[in-house]
Amino acid sequence: MRFGLFTSMGAQTWSGVLDLWRHIEATGWDIGCVADHFMPNTKEREGAVLESWSTLSALAALVPRIRVGTIVLGNTYRHPAVVAKMAAQLDIISGGRLLLGLGAGWQENEHEAYGIPFYTMRERLERLDEACQVMKSLWTQRRSDFEGRYYRLADAPLDPKPVQTPHPELMIGGGGERVTLRIVAKHADHWNVWGGARVLAQKGAVLDEHCAAVGRDPKTITRSANMALLITDKKDQVERLAETIATRLGRHAADPRDTCLAGTPDQIRDQLHQLREAGVSVLFIPSVFRPLDELRRDLDRFITEIAPAFR
C-alpha cells in the first residue's frame, strides 16, 4: 500500500502547507494532494482558502520526491482543455509525478458567488465524461478534434506533452454507483472515494460490474480511500470524529464511522488489513477534521509504527 496526505486549503498559510509537505516527504509518505475550493462551504463564506493549482505547482517544485495531486479538481470550474494544458505543465515541473484528480463539482456556494453555472447533477456528470475524453485526447494526440454535447476541439494542439506516458495518472473522485462509477470504468486510471473497507468493498463490486460492461480489467484501476486518522484508546473520541465527518461531509460520507481510521494501533492495523482485502492500494489521510498539531503527531506515529507492515 501507499500512503498520502490530503491537505485542505482552508485556514492555511502558504508557509504552513510547505512546511507540512516537506515534513511528510522527509518522514516517508508517498503522495500529497490538495483540495480544490475557493471558499468555505458555509452560508457566511468567510475564511481564507488557498488556490489549489498555483499552490500545487509551487509544492511540486519545492518538494521533489512524493507524487503530487488533487482531490479533486471541480470540472465545472475550468474548461477541460485548459486543465489538460495546466496538467501537462505541472507534470513537467514535477518530473512526471502528477496525480490528476477530477470530479463533477459539488460545492454550490462557489458557483453562486462567482457566477459559475451550477448544472444539474446529470449534466455535471455528462460534462465529466466528456472532459476525460478531451484531456486524454490532448495529452496523447498531436492534434485533437472532438465534438461533444458540451465541449469542442478543432485541430487542437497541446505541446509540450506531459512526462508520464501515455498521460498523467487520471483519478476520478466519487462514489455514485449508477453513473460516476461507469465513468470511472471508462476513463480512470485511479478511483478515489470517502470511506473505509465496507464502502470500498460495496462500491468496488459495482465498479467491477461497470468494468465488465465496458470490457475492462478492473485490476487496471487503482483504488484509494480517504479516511480520517485518530490514534486513541478512547471510544468517545472516535464517535466525536465520526460526528464531525457526518457534519462536514454530509451526503459525501456514505458511512461516517467507516470513514474513521481510528482506534489503537492494533485496531488501525486491522482496518488496514480489511482495506487491502477490499482492493484498496492507496490510503489518503485528510487534514480537515482535526487541529493540525494533533493530527501531525498521529501522522508521524502512523507512518513509523503502522504503515511499514503494509508496504
Residue ranges and their predicted role:
Residues 1-311:
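Active-site-adjacent structural elements that line small-molecule/cofactor binding pockets in enzymes
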